[in-house]
């Protein structure tokens, strides 16, 4: 009996010793693997870049554009950019491959081929009737024309801000603007807007509600009109509804994925003086104009700096959506 007990105890002790040996062996193996792994990391670390230092720009690139040393992915690598320009630019350049040339130049700034779209428009008036902006970032080039300052200013106000709009039935109802952010926006091939302010008895102030010839004319044969009248006063309106549509709109705030670039002109259009523009900064810039090639070269050179002043937004703009909400 004692022999069996001794054998059992001996077997137990041997098992404990073997288990201890196995555990120590495993520990030594794990230490060996971990230390070797850390040694490899230490050796290779000088050869690895821990951060993304941005796009490797060629020497001919813009040195004026600041690039932040950041691990954040650059937005333009996964975004689309639309460039709107007047048709006279393509006419002057007179080169069938000029868009391909610009695409290659945008590539040097980090915009992959196929991410930049070129869209032309005939003139400011026609563009204001049917603005369509579907890209993540939208740059609108407007050549300065002293005779079109008002149209350019109103178009910039329309594009650079979001508006909540509702239809107006001017044949049945009077309308009033509640505050400075409330405007009446008209679009069409020819918009002539006349207004007649009313007193509390709905009688015309300086006009007859039954005679549109006595109404005050605030716009004549325009394609885009942003009408501002005295707040809190009812008005009867007369609009050329056969060629124009009018909407009651409320300015909600800036549309941050749009920038307007004024091309040429001694004066810079400024819509920030409008009390409804908050904050008092806008994505409206100016570049010198001599030739359109020079303009496009400047845009390419500063595109990333311009985009940094904008914010990527998913909401698109077109004339149909504008009437209700943009």
Swiss-Prot record:
A GO molecular-function descriptor: metal ion binding
Cellular compartment(s): Virion; Host endoplasmic reticulum lumen
Disulfide bond residue pairs: 82-135, 165-249, 191-244, 196-207
Gene Ontology cellular component list: host cell endoplasmic reticulum lumen; T=13 icosahedral viral capsid; viral outer capsid
N-terminal signal peptide: 1-50
Coiled coil: none
Glycosylation sites: 69, 238
Record note on modification: N-glycosylated. The N-terminus is blocked possibly by pyroglutamic acid.
Binding-site residues, Ca(2+) 1: 95, 206, 214, 216
Keyword set, alphabetical order: Calcium, Capsid protein, Disulfide bond, Glycoprotein, Host endoplasmic reticulum, Host-virus interaction, Metal-binding, Outer capsid protein, Signal, T=13 icosahedral capsid protein, Virion
GPR motif: annotated segments: 253-255
Taxonomy, superkingdom: Viruses
Residues given in the record as Ca(2+) 2 binding sites: 177, 228-229, 231, 301
Region CNP motif: start-end pairs: 165-167
Family under the similarity heading: Belongs to the rotavirus VP7 family.
SUBUNIT field: Homotrimer; disulfide-linked. 2 Ca(2+) ions bound at each subunit interface in the trimer hold the trimer together. Interacts with the intermediate capsid protein VP6. Interacts with the outer capsid protein VP5*.
More info: Some rotavirus strains are neuraminidase-sensitive and require sialic acid to attach to the cell surface. Some rotavirus strains are integrin-dependent. Some rotavirus strains depend on ganglioside for their entry into the host cell. Hsp70 also seems to be involved in the entry of some strains.
Stated role: Calcium-binding protein that interacts with rotavirus cell receptors once the initial attachment by VP4 has been achieved. Rotavirus attachment and entry into the host cell probably involves multiple sequential contacts between the outer capsid proteins VP4 and VP7, and the cell receptors. Following entry into the host cell, low intracellular or intravesicular Ca(2+) concentration probably causes the calcium-stabilized VP7 trimers to dissociate from the virion. This step is probably necessary for the membrane-disrupting entry step and the release of VP4, which is locked onto the virion by VP7.
Entry protein name: Outer capsid glycoprotein VP7
Species annotation: Rotavirus A (strain RVA/Human/United States/P/1974/G3P1A[8])
């Amino acid at each position: 009996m004692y022999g069996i007990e001794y054998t059992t105890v001996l077997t137990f002790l041997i098992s404990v010793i073997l288990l201890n040996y196995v555990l120590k062996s495993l520990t030594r193996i794990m230490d060996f693997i971990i230390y070797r792994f850390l040694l490899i990391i230490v050796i290779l670390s000088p050869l690895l870049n821990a951060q993304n230092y941005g796009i490797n720009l060629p020497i001919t690139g813009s040195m004026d554009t600041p690039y932040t040393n950041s691990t954040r992915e650059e937005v333009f690598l996964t975004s689309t950019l639309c460039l709107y320009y007047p048709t006279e630019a393509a006419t002057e350049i007179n080169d069938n491959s000029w868009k391909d040339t610009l695409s290659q130049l945008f590539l040097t700034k980090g915009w992959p081929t196929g991410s930049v779209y070129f869209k032309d428009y005939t003139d400011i008036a026609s563009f204001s009737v049917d603005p369509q902006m579907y890209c993540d970032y939208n740059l609108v080039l407007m050549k300065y024309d002293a005779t079109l300052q008002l149209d350019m200013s109103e178009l910039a106000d329309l594009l650079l801000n979001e508006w909540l709009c509702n239809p107006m039935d001017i044949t049945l109802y009077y309308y009033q603007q509640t505050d400075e952010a409330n405007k009446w926006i008209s679009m069409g091939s020819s918009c002539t807007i006349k207004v007649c302010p009313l007193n509390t008895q709905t009688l015309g102030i300086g006009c007859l509600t039954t005679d549109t010839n006595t109404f005050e004319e605030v716009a004549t044969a325009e394609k885009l009109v942003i009408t501002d009248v005295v707040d809190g006063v009812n008005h009867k309106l007369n609009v050329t509804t056969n060629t124009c549509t009018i909407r009651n709109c409320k300015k909600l705030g800036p549309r941050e994925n749009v920038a307007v670039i004024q091309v040429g002109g001694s004066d810079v259009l400024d819509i920030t003086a409008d009390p409804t523009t908050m904050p008092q900064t806008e994505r409206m810039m100016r570049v010198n104009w001599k030739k359109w090639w020079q303009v496009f070269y400047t845009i390419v050179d500063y595109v990333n700096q311009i985009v940094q002043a904008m914010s990527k937004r998913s909401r698109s703009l077109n004339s149909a959506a504008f009437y209700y909400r943009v």
